[in-house]
Amino acid sequence: MNVYRCPVCGYLQLGEKDFHFCPVCKTPAESFYRDPTMERSANWDTKSRMMIQHMAKTGHYFLEGKGTTRQFLNMDDLLFMPGQIATPPLLDDIPVKAEVVLGKNSPQAILLKTPILNAGMSFGALSREAKIALAKASRMVGGIANTGEGGMLDEEREFAEKITLQYASGRFGADESRLTQADMIEIKISQGAKPGMGGKLPGKKVTEEIARIRQIPSGKMAESPSRHKDIETPEDLSKKIAWLREITGGKPISLKFVGGHLEKDLDAIFSQANIPDVLVIDGGEGGTGAAPVFTKDHVGLPLVYSLPTVADYLRKNGLREKVTLIATGGIRHSGDVAKAIALGAEAVYMAGALKIAMGCKYIRECHLGTCPYGIATQDTRLRKRLDVENAAQRIANFIRAATDEVKTIARICGKNDIHKLNKDDLRAINSELARVTGVETASGGVE
């Protein structure tokens, strides 16, 4: 079997060169070269050997930035069925709605102009400049910024019209005064890159400013536990939701979790007196500033398996009018956004795509703090390389263009609202994908 190597990130493609881009760093397939040395030992790829050598030398697991490099089943083999005769496409001048409501029954509901929202990326993992650019871009497009688990920068609150404060297990910068400044609170149970694990920010990255925002000592490692210590039962979660609603005056409360024992987890969440206004399902493809490769590659369900299950649960239990569903984890472009919506999401979180829009070249050095583009670093010399205004404009341009593309897909399908897209508008050209999503195959029927 032939093995082709990406010259940029080292990804190995087994088989023929029947693809267009590297699934990891998006290098064109034409740049891949055949690697005969790997053809003799395809199972022992460079990354596996490198991880073994690292573990043997240090006695610790191998950390890496971004998401998994594994190729999980994704939405690429779902295709939209264009309207033709029976259901014609809409004319170009017919407007298509794309607004999203967070907190449908909340006294402080949030109306957004785009379904493409900022995922949680913390100050510490990202530079101050990157965080400000994301906040400014969210205002430009009528979206909502997200603090991530590292607390809220004053400038984030200043420049973002709407902002979500992430309430994670470390509770960094999440005292009552900050909670009341946010427009939505997101209880982070877990994330796709490292579900069931806490986080560690090395002491050398805990600058005085980061320490002030996170409300921790400077120069010392910032650690968050594997779970919320005061949320041990579904009842505890219900009480936490009620408390957060009370202190914020009824602002929307979001809950973020990863695909695992989905039905049991959903029953545990929605059998309680207090339920979230927004539910975020994160796929195992989700990226992060630093995570062990073994969790990224082997723990947590990919989004395409989780999203349809969660969406069907909400529909069957009459929760669609109460809960807004957000999908995240490896969402790359408008095709992914539109397909996620057709599978039941009302909005998506993007992280990697927004960093690429502002200048990230995906070299996977996020965890080292040496990002040469000034995005995932606290090095003052490197941070100067990121032009905040230009980065904000580029992010906004991308979100606007991608939102327009999603609207166009809806128009092609004869829909005047992106939220009218559904499984009937899709066909699968992969039988496994048809089976897990409930979408008909292109040849007819659900596998």
Q: Where do the protein language model's features map onto the residues?
A:
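Alpha/beta catalytic cores of nucleotide-metabolism and tRNA/nucleoside-modifying enzymes
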Residues: 10, 34-87, 298, 309-322, ...
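The −1 position to Zn-ligating cysteines in a subset of zinc-ribbon hairpins
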Residues: 5, 21, 370
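Conserved, well-structured core domains of diverse proteins
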Residues: 33-116, 120-139, 143-144, 151-152, ...
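Short metal-coordination and nucleic-acid-contact micro-motifs, chiefly zinc-binding Cys/His arrays
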Residues: 2, 18, 367
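Glycine-rich phosphate/ribose-binding loops and adjacent secondary-structure elements
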Residues: 228-383
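Short Cys/His-rich micro-motifs in 6-15 aa windows
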Residues: 25-34
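Gly-rich Lys/Arg/Thr-decorated short loops/hinges at beta-loop-alpha junctions or inter-strand turns
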Residues: 112-117, 195, 213-226, 246-249, ...
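Short linker/helix segments within small regulatory modules
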Residues: 14-21
